[in-house]
Amino acid sequence: MAKDAIKMTGKVIKAYNTDEYDVELENGIVVRAHISGKIRVHHITILRGDTVDVELSTYDLTKGRIVYRHR
């Protein structure tokens, strides 16, 4: 994303398919997020309950992209 993207940490609460998830952010807001290309290429599995880093666009704060899965 652009330099002005907002990076936040959250927890996956629901998985829709292999690359769409509902993530509850630290501040309690739930956003729909998809996985980034690097996570898809390296076949990193994201499950319900995982802690992830999400980048949010400043234009639409209801959608984001999962850029990192914490261990």
Curated annotation (Swiss-Prot):
Residues 1-71 form the S1-like domain. It is found in: Cytoplasm. Component of the 30S ribosomal translation pre-initiation complex which assembles on the 30S ribosome in the order IF-2 and IF-3, IF-1 and N-formylmethionyl-tRNA(fMet); mRNA recruitment can occur at any time during PIC assembly. Its main location: cytoplasm. Transmembrane segments: none annotated. One of the essential components for the initiation of protein synthesis. Stabilizes the binding of IF-2 and IF-3 on the 30S subunit to which N-formylmethionyl-tRNA(fMet) subsequently binds. Helps modulate mRNA selection, yielding the 30S pre-initiation complex (PIC). Upon addition of the 50S ribosomal subunit IF-1, IF-2 and IF-3 are released leaving the mature 70S translation initiation complex. It comes from the Bacteria. This is Translation initiation factor IF-1. The gene is infA. GO terms for molecular function: ribosome binding; rRNA binding; translation initiation factor activity. Belongs to the IF-1 family. GO terms for cellular component: cytosol. NCBIfam families: infA (TIGR00008). It comes from Mycoplasma mobile (strain ATCC 43663 / 163K / NCTC 11711). InterPro entries: NA-bd_OB-fold, RNA-binding_domain_S1_IF1, S1_domain, TIF_IF1. Keywords: Cytoplasm, Initiation factor, Protein biosynthesis, RNA-binding, rRNA-binding.
